[in-house]
Amino acid sequence: MNTLHMLLVICCLAGIYQTTLALKEEDCEVCVKTVRKFASSLDDATKKDYKLIEVAFKKYCKTQKNKEHRFCYYLGGLEESATGILNELSKPLSWSMPAEKICEKLKKKDAQICDLRYEKQIDLNNVDLKKLKVRDLKKILNDWDESCDGCLEKSDFIKRIEELKPKYAHNEL
C-alpha cells in the first residue's frame, strides 16, 4: 500500500513539474498565434493529411507579412527559405496537437522561432503623434498598407496619419 501511495505522489509531482515547464503563449507568441490562426483556417479534410497541410501552409505564407512572414521563412514555408522543418508543423497539426506543444517542438529544432516577438501596438487614440519618431510614423502607415508620397517632414507624416485615422481608428478600439 505504501509503494502504491508513493508511486501516486511521484506521478502527481511529475505532472505538475511537466506543466510548469510547458511553453506558454507569451514565451513564443508569434509561433502560437500563427499556428492557431493557420489551423483554424483549415478544413477538416486538410487537417487529417500532413501533405495537404504543408501545401496549405505554403499558400498561407504567401499572404503573410512582418513577424508571421519571418516565421514562415524559418519553417520553410516560403520559396526563398534556406531550411525546411515544415513537417515539424504539419504532422503534429494532423494529430490535432495544441499550438503550444507544436511551438515547443519547433523551438527545440530552431530556437530563433520563439525569439520572434510582436512589437507593442501604438494606441493612436491616446498617443501624441508629434512625440513619435518618423520611423514610428512610417511604421503606422506601413501597417495600414498605406504610403505617404511626397512626405519629407515629420509634419507631413502626421498629416497623412490624421487623414487616414478615421478609416483605421475603429480597429484600434
UniProtKB/Swiss-Prot annotation:
One of its GO terms (biological process) is dopamine metabolic process. InterPro entries: ARMET-like, ARMET_C, ARMET_N, EF_Hand_1_Ca_BS, EF_hand_dom, SAP_dom_sf. The keyword Signal applies. GO terms for molecular function: calcium ion binding. Gene3D superfamilies: SAP domain, Saposin-like. Disulfide bonds join 28-114, 31-103, 61-72, 148-151. It is found in: Secreted. Residues 1-22 form the signal peptide. Keywords: Developmental protein, Disulfide bond, Secreted, Signal. One of its GO terms (cellular component) is endoplasmic reticulum. Required during the maturation of the embryonic nervous system for maintenance of neuronal and cuticular connectivity. Essential for maintenance of dopaminergic neurons and dopamine levels. Belongs to the ARMET family. PANTHER family: ARMET-LIKE PROTEIN (PTHR12990), MESENCEPHALIC ASTROCYTE-DERIVED NEUROTROPHIC FACTOR HOMOLOG (PTHR12990:SF5). This is Mesencephalic astrocyte-derived neurotrophic factor homolog. It comes from Drosophila willistoni.
